[in-house]
């Protein structure tokens, strides 16, 4: 062999064998070549797909403790949900498993999480993170199994607190820290459509690319643009929300250029459909903004993990290229999760198969009957820390006081909370958005923690002056989209409405303090600061005058409920009447 050949320094017998092999190939090539060139006779090379599992938990809302139900069965809590997630992680066949959190992980939380600024919730999910999470900048970070995006409630405490929650540190907080100093979240936060006003750059990375055991997968995040009408303006003064579809599509070509074609979107926006059991079915009818957003997505988007509406979603919807997108949402408050299975071609990187199941986390069904020991111990310590405040008995409920609405849209719980805010501010009337009612009051002893769970936002109750005409206008605003109709609980007034009439003329027969509403008269109105700033689209409140701040919402409810004759009965109702 020629000098410099890699074989020239081998024994002569190896050189001879190598030469005979080359000669044999030359002689046989004309015979064998037709078989390689003829598709009919050639055996194609196949590659087994890479199987990837994603476990998506949307709208957790700090639901570490038990107390939730799904289909009238106990469901959820940190220990129960953990038992389900760990069982799914341990399943055979997947090359990689990711846990995805499509927003509202925190906010509107029960006291076990909310009183500690939702650090317990983020610490709970940190327990699922592998060793590569939290290793930003290292080669290992591409194997982190946790990814999350923002929901509207991530902004409840403003940007400074949101940044602290993600990156860690105690900041200016005065709470007890279960882990001190607070280490931050180990999830990789992604969001493509929330940018800093100062420079237009995303607040967090728009996307991440993850190794998936022989394949790569991209996660792109987006929060609902409706956040601007769902949050206090002061909480969003440093950021801008961009169109969800356009923002996601902006980054698809970028991940494609990196050779990634398996694309999953964490979207904090949702819809609704009729629930069912089992794998994803064809032909499902999904309503809501999520369908419109998906319809405009880049053809290379494969999966959308949705959230926000707290509903069931498991469907195939078309994207802008007519290709099917798997869309999921698994209720809320730790009661369920989406178990998503993907097959990825290891050569092309495309997703070749996708299906999901929405799995209820029932407490009385295995594996929920064996709560996760580590999560149970964590919850016990959390409850011990907050017990001195949450365990204080405030009142006794004669019967359940629920948020179940009558046909006219009124509930006993809404009436009670509105009465409490009106009493706190000595106002003529009070308005409460029913979306702020986050738990119900059960018969028996009512603790401070029970009432905090009803009103967990720590909003400030205030009083302002409105004209009679402005009161009427506020009631008419209940039917504007995208809000659900008649979603204001009221106190100190009553009215009749006809939802079939044209906008601006649906409300009639308004009575205040037993007398007909006088359009020219000035009335004092109580509400929380969120509504006063135009939250939920109630812009009329921004025109109120003589604003005076009062107590925090839960304090108003605690004081009022404790002052009532015991045991407390639900308010009589009859404040809202539906015509016809």
Residue ranges of predicted features:
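Acidic, metal/ion-coordinating pockets
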Residues: 36, 43-363, 408-420, 430, ...
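Secretory targeting signatures
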Residues: 1-38
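Non-catalytic terminal accessory segments
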Residues: 15-23, 36-51, 55-57, 61, ...
């Amino acid at each position: 062999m020629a000098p410099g050949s890699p074989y020239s320094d081998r024994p002569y017998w190896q050189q001879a064998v190598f030469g005979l092999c080359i000669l044999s190939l030359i002689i046989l090539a004309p015979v064998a070549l037709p078989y390689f060139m003829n598709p009919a006779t050639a055996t194609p090379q196949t590659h087994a797909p890479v199987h990837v599992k994603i476990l998506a938990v949307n709208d957790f809302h700090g639901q570490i403790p038990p107390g939730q139900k799904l289909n009238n069965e106990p469901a959820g809590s940190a220990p129960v949900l953990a038992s389900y997630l760990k069982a799914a992680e341990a399943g055979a066949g997947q090359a990689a498993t990711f846990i995805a959190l499509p927003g509202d992980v925190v906010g509107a939380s029960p006291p076990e999480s909310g009183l500690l600024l939702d650090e317990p919730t983020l610490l709970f999910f940190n327990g699922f993170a592998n060793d590569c999470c939290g290793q930003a900048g290292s080669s290992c970070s591409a194997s982190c199994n946790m990814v999350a995006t923002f929901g509207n409630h991530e902004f409840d405490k403003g940007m400074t607190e949101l940044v602290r929650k993600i990156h860690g540190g105690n900041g200016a907080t005065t709470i007890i820290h279960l882990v001190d100093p607070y280490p931050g979240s180990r999830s990789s936060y992604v969001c493509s459509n929330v940018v800093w006003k100062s420079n237009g750059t995303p607040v967090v990375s728009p996307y991440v690319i993850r190794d998936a055991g022989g394949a790569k997968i991209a996660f792109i995040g987006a929060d609902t643009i409706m956040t601007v009408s769902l949050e206090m303006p002061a909480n969003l003064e440093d950021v801008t929300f961009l169109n969800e579809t356009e923002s996601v599509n902006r980054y698809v070509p970028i991940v494609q250029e990196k050779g990634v074609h398996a694309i999953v979107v964490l979207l904090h926006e949702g819809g609704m459909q009729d629930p069912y059991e089992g794998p994803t079915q064809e032909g499902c009818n999904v309503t809501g903004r999520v369908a419109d957003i998906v319809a405009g997505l880049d053809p290379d988007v494969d999966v959308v993990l949705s959230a926000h509406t707290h509903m069931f979603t498991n469907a195939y919807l078309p994207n802008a290229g007519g290709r099917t997108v798997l869309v999921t949402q698994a209720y809320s408050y730790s009661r369920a999760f989406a178990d998503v299975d993907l097959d990825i071609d290891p050569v092309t990187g495309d997703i070749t198969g996708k299906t999901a199941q929405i799995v209820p986390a029932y407490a009385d069904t295995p594996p929920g009957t064996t709560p996760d020991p580590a999560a149970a111990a964590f919850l016990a310590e959390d409850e011990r820390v907050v017990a001195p405040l949450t365990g204080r008995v405030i009142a006794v409920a004669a019967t359940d006081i629920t948020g179940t609405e009558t046909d006219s849209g009124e509930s006993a719980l809404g009436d009670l909370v509105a009465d409490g805010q009106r009493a706190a501010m000595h106002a003529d009337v009070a308005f409460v958005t029913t979306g702020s009612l986050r738990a119900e009051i059960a018969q028996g002893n009512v603790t401070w923690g029970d009432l905090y769970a009803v009103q967990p936002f720590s909003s400030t109750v205030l009083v302002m002056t409105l004209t009679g005409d402005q009161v009427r206008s506020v009631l008419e605003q209940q039917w504007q989209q995208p809000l659900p109709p008649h979603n204001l609980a009221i106190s100190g007034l009553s009215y009749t409405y006809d939802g079939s009439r044209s906008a601006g003329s649906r409300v009639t027969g308004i009575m205040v303090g037993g007398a007909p509403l006088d359009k020219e008269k000035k009335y004092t109105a109580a509400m929380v600061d969120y509504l006063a700033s135009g939250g939920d689209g109630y812009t009329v409140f921004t025109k109120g005058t003589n604003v005076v701040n009062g107590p925090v919402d839960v304090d108003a409810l605690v004081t009022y409920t404790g002052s009532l004759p015991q045991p407390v009965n639900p308010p009589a109702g009859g404040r809202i009447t539906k015509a016809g």
